[in-house]
């Protein structure tokens, strides 16, 4: 064979070999992704949860890998709730197989134990998980554009132009996790009792939270899903809590958790520039102690006159909510 012909054949041979290798790799990765989906389904069903997937269809060759999951149904083993959707797509980058993206392609119906249904829809609703190694979480998150929550049995719908939530290990301390939540341009479905003057439009709700003993959150116990986390000393540290709603514009800090009776236990410190509307709304709320109602109303009237700002100290201890040290109302168990 002439050298000239050899130099023509070698590149084509390498190209064909690379193409065949990529075809093999893509199909191997697709098969492995399907296997993991079915393994997760089997594991959930074995634990009492019901997971049903009508059909898995492969798409995206040669550049992308997308598994179309049709007729997905998830019924939790505890809590009595279930979720259903006609389609969700699992996207995997063949060059980054440890990063998976799940995108809702149809509305999601969530049914609670009491039969109430919330329909979830969005222009884009994406959940992603990125792993370090085989089983170490690097980051997980959910992002939605024009999110709509509609409960057909209730008046109105909740709308948020943008919602982003992420969780990742906190590099500053082993066993702690950072949780971030940011919702912008929110429209509430209906007025909030005693806060009617604040309106339905919430410009922003943002939280930066550190969860201690985060791994214990996943160790649910029957009838007490957060029991292991609470008993293990789990707490939440609010490094920032921002709320821009009507006359209330604040960014505070605090910490909290649950007591042995599953009631809120902790403290928030919220700087408020215009405290009168906030104090008035709290005073007019349900189940407020009569003495606290009078004290809060007088305090609100004083701030109307002075126009001063305030740093609200809100505490929850021994089953009682306190504002500026005043016992305001009893606190029921969270669940």
Feature map (PLM): residue ranges:
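Extended lipid/amphipathic-ligand handling interfaces
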Residues: 56-59, 85-95, 121-135, 158-174, ...
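Hydrophobic membrane-insertion alpha-helices, especially the h-region
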Residues: 8-26
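N-terminal beta-strand/beta-hairpin edge segment
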Residues: 46-174
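Extended terminal
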Residues: 2-13, 54-55, 224-235, 241-244, ...
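Alpha-helical transmembrane signal-anchor/signal-peptide segments
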Residues: 28-45
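Short, hydrophobic/aromatic-rich segments at coil-to-beta transitions
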Residues: 66, 138-141, 176-180, 233-240
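Flexible, membrane-facing loop/turn or short amphipathic-helix motifs
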Residues: 73-81, 108-119, 146-158, 187-199, ...
């Amino acid at each position: 064979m002439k050298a000239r012909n050899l130099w023509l054949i070698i590149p084509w041979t390498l190209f064909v070999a690379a193409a065949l290798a990529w075809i093999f790799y893509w199909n191997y990765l697709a098969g492995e992704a399907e296997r993991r989906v079915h393994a997760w389904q089997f594991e959930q069903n074995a634990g009492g949860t019901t997971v049903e997937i009508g059909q898995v269809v492969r798409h995206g060759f040669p550049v992308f890998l997308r598994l179309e999951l049709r007729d997905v149904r998830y019924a939790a083993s505890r809590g009595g709730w279930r979720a259903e959707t006609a389609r969700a797509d699992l996207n995997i980058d063949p060059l980054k197989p440890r990063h998976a993206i799940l995108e809702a392609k149809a509305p999601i119906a969530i049914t609670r134990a009491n039969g109430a249904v919330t329909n979830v829809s969005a222009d884009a609703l994406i959940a992603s998980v990125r792993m370090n190694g085989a089983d170490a979480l690097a980051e997980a998150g959910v992002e939605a554009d024009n999110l709509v929550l509609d409960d057909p049995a209730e008046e109105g719908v909740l709308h948020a132009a943008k919602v982003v939530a992420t969780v990742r290990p906190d590099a500053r301390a082993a066993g702690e996790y950072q949780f971030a939540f940011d919702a912008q341009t929110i429209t509430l479905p209906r007025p909030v009792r005693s806060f009617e003057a604040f309106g339905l439009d919430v410009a922003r709700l943002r939280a930066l939270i550190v969860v201690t003993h985060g791994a214990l959150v996943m160790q649910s116990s029957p009838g007490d899903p957060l029991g292991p986390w609470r008993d293990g000393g789990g707490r939440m540290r609010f490094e920032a809590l921002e709320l821009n709603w009507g006359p209330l514009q604040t960014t505070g800090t605090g910490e909290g958790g649950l007591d042995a009776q599953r009631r809120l236990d902790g403290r928030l410190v919220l700087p408020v520039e215009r405290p009168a509307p906030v104090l008035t709304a709290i005073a007019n709320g349900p189940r407020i102690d009569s003495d606290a109602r009078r004290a809060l109303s007088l305090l609100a009237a004083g701030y109307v006159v002075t126009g001063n700002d305030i740093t609200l100290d809100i505490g929850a201890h021994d089953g009682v909510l306190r504002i500026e040290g005043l016992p305001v109302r009893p606190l029921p168990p969270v669940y």
